Design a protein with these regions (language model features):
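A short core secondary-structure module
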Residues: 101-102, 106-155
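Buried hydrophobic positions in well-ordered alpha/beta secondary-structure cores of metabolic enzymes
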Residues: 3, 10, 26, 57, ...
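Glycine-rich beta->alpha junctions and the first turn(s) of the following alpha-helix
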Residues: 154-253
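Short Ser/Thr-interspersed hydrophobic loop/turn segments at strand-loop and sheet-helix junctions
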Residues: 27-31, 125, 145-150, 176-179
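A short, Trp-centered hydrophobic/proline-enriched beta-strand micro-motif
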Residues: 70-78
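Internal helix-loop-helix
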Residues: 4-71, 112-120, 252
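Short Gly/Pro-enriched turn/cap motifs at secondary-structure boundaries
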Residues: 82-85, 111-114, 134, 161-168
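A structural signal for short hydrophobic beta-strand segments in well-ordered beta-sheet cores
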Residues: 92-96
């Protein structure tokens, strides 16, 4: 009702149209109370639907962004069982059909934040395309998929983690999924640009939520230092406690 899931989405698509500064302030406040909610909101807007916002055409934005403001959570499918920080080393593959109307998508994605809840996935996959010299090369393309597509299998939903258990990570298999050509984001072979641009936004905004959690922890430590007495004096009177609080304050700043 408050529009938090559509904070950065333009107003013409039903969002609030917030800039980055306003957005990170909200995330910082959310992070003070619930890390899981901060991750859910940030993953949805910073890397999930951000690809559609930045690289979608007018038709794609009009089709998907209103749903992403209201009843859809989005997921970013980049990491794979054998592919982590090497974003260009995708083993998931897509191949165009002979009539050029679909991409046939095959592969597996891992650690997709909110993937078990999402109505829209941005999926990175290697595709054979012709290079500038006319030779065939493999490049990453970005495709939009939905969980109801035939061949999409969300076969593992994980909340058994050390923390942030309010988010559902997922492992997703794509088995001969027919993705319409209209679901291609940006251009063929430009998916790595899509992925890295979205990750840059995520680094900025997710860190705001973590800052909120750190600030909250510092506030609690200060409160405890003032109210907890040992040796007939509050803990805040001891030099070691003051040094620790000062260090926490410096890190938060």
């Amino acid at each position: 009702k408050m529009g938090v899931m559509g904070m950065t989405i333009p107003k013409e698509y039903g969002g609030l149209g917030m800039g980055v500064t306003s957005y990170v302030r909200v995330l910082e406040k959310i992070g003070q109370y619930c890390g899981s909610t901060a991750v859910l909101v940030s993953a949805h807007q910073s890397i999930g639907c951000k690809a559609v916002m930045l690289f979608g055409n007018a038709e794609q934005k009009a089709k998907w962004l209103p749903r992403l403001c209201t009843d859809w959570v989005s997921a970013f499918c980049l990491s794979e069982p054998n592919v982590g920080c090497d974003a260009g080393g995708q083993e998931t593959r897509c191949e165009k059909t002979e009539d050029g109307e679909f991409y046939i998508l095959n592969g597996e994605k891992k650690w997709a934040t909110s993937g078990a809840l999402s109505g829209l996935f941005t999926v990175m996959a290697k595709q054979k395309i012709k290079g500038k010299d006319g030779k065939e090369v493999e490049r990453v393309s970005a495709l939009v998929c939905h969980p109801e597509m035939e061949g999409v299998d969300i076969y593992q939903k994980n909340r058994s983690k050390c923390g942030i258990r309010g988010t559902w990570q997922a492992r997703i298999r794509f088995n001969n999924v027919r993705v319409p050509k209209a679901n291609l984001l940006h251009d063929e072979g430009k998916g790595l640009n899509v992925a890295l641009t979205c990750l840059n936004y995520g680094r900025c905004t997710l860190s705001a939520g973590m800052l909120g959690g750190a600030t909250r922890a510092m506030d609690q430590a200060i409160k405890w230092g003032r109210t907890r007495y040992q040796f007939q004096r509050p803990l805040a009177d001891f030099d070691l406690t003051q040094q620790k609080i000062a260090r926490m304050s410096a890190y938060c700043y």
